[in-house]
Design a protein with these regions (language model features):
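Non-catalytic C-terminal accessory region of glycerolipid acyltransferases
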Residues: 1-18, 142-252
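A transmembrane-helix-recognition feature enriched in membrane-embedded lipid enzymes
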Residues: 13-74, 126-130
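Short, flexible loop segments at the rims of nucleotide/cofactor-binding pockets, characterized by
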Residues: 65-68, 89-90, 135-139, 169
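Generic preference for hydrophobic
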Residues: 75, 89, 112, 217-219
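Glycine-rich helix-loop-beta junction characteristic of Rossmann-like nucleotide cofactor-binding loops
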Residues: 77-82
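Generic beta-sheet signal
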Residues: 85-91, 110, 156-162
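Short, hinge-like loop/turn segments at secondary-structure boundaries
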Residues: 92, 129-131, 208-211
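Membrane-embedded segments
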Residues: 96-147, 152
Length: 252
């Protein structure tokens, strides 16, 4: 009996793995197709100066991708956003899917702080830069503040991936102080955001998604920046990093 069970398990496991791999390849191809199709109205919105039109497009885009990939998603801590007119999300960064998860699960309109290198991507880079996102480089301090204030006036909330880039592990790495600096300069509250599960779905360097994963966004209590000065950005960064670490560790 034990031998038969072992043989049965050995025969089933490779087949299950094969089905998951096929699902992953098909889901990746379809996700690329969805992206190409949805990029057309998004790019058109950017050309027309109608950045707000991008939000419903991204809702449809991310819904299609998440359903195709069999992703189970949830968000907790929305009560922390009550009473906030605008804010800066400060999050960890594990995967390209982080952006999709924020677009899909966060209420309101969210835009991102992106490095100038994104502009080199045809069509996508132009769309990102002209739909309310903040494109920065090392010399863009004053311009970043102006763009953040403009985004605030347009009703956008800004998301900042404070680790600087993606890491292919299950750790929270040291936060850069750029988000804290921008929040203090614009006097906007910071909301810590822990993103869990996206690294398993599509790790850095992976060409195909791993379907059937669970993604969770956890929002922490906002940290008000009114009255803070530039010298407070180190302490603010540490508080944000600690909050994200605690929420990330508590995520099953």
């Amino acid at each position: 009996m034990n031998d038969e069970s072992s043989l049965s398990g050995a025969a089933t496991l490779p087949r299950d793995n094969l089905l998951m791999r096929v699902w992953g390849v098909v889901a990746t191809i379809l996700s690329v197709l969805y992206t190409a199709i949805c990029l057309i109205p998004a790019w058109t919105s950017a050309r027309l100066g109608k950045g707000h039109w991008v939000t419903p497009v991204t809702r449809i885009w991310t819904w299609l991708i998440f359903r195709t990939c069999g992703i189970k998603d949830e968000i907790e801590g929305l009560e922390h956003l009550k009473g906030l007119d605008s804010f800066i999300l400060v999050a960890n960064h594990k995967s390209l899917v982080d952006i999709l998860a924020v677009f899909r699960l966060m209420p309101g309109e969210v835009r991102f702080v992106a490095k100038r290198e994104i502009m080199k991507v045809p069509v996508f880079g132009y769309t990102m830069a002209n739909c309310g996102n903040i494109v920065i480089d090392r010399q863009s301090g004053g311009r970043a503040i102006r763009h953040a204030l403009a985004a605030q006036r347009e009703g956008y909330n800004i998301c900042f991936f404070a680790e600087g880039h993606r890491f292919n592990d299950d750790l929270i790495h040291e936060f850069n102080d750029g988000a804290a600096w921008l929040a203090i300069a614009t006097k906007q509250p910071c909301v810590p955001l822990a993103i869990s599960g996206t690294g398993a779905l599509m790790p850095r360097g992976s060409k195909f998604v791993r379907p059937g994963q669970r993604i969770r966004l956890s929002l922490g209590a906002p940290i008000l920046t009114a009255g803070m000065r530039g010298g407070d950005r180190v302490e603010l960064t540490q508080r944000l990093e600690t909050a994200v670490r605690v929420m990330y560790r508590s995520t099953p």
